[in-house]
Curated annotation (Swiss-Prot):
Propeptide residue span(s): 20-28
GO molecular function: ion channel inhibitor activity; potassium channel regulator activity; toxin activity
Localization: Secreted
Protein name: Potassium channel toxin MeuTXKalpha2
Keywords: Disulfide bond, Ion channel impairing toxin, Neurotoxin, Potassium channel impairing toxin, Secreted, Signal, Toxin, Voltage-gated potassium channel impairing toxin
Tissue spec: Expressed by the venom gland.
Function (record text): Inhibits Kv1.1/KCNA1, Kv1.3/KCNA3 and Shaker potassium channels.
Disulphide bridges, residue numbers: C31-C47, C34-C52, C38-C54
Family: Belongs to the short scorpion toxin superfamily. Potassium channel inhibitor family. Alpha-KTx 08 subfamily.
Major place of residence: secreted
Domain characteristics, as noted in the entry: Has the structural arrangement of an alpha-helix connected to a beta-sheet by disulfide bonds (CSalpha/beta).
Length: 57
């Protein structure tokens, strides 16, 4: 019975981690697509080392 609880706990922790992780990922958007990409988030586009960075307005 304790193995069942352990499996359920691991599944719940994994679910929480997978929910949080996409928010922390770095999006690989080229500088050409940066203005459109940041406009969808209502943020200002900035290109840094050939990488798109969205900053708050």
């Amino acid at each position: 019975m304790s193995r069942l609880y352990a499996i359920i706990l691991i599944a719940l922790v994994f679910n929480v981690i997978m929910t949080i992780m996409p928010d922390m990922k770095v999006e690989a958007v080229s500088c050409e697509d940066c203005p459109e990409h940041c406009a969808t988030k209502d943020q200002r586009a900035k290109c840094d080392n050939d990488r798109c960075v969205c900053e708050p307005k």
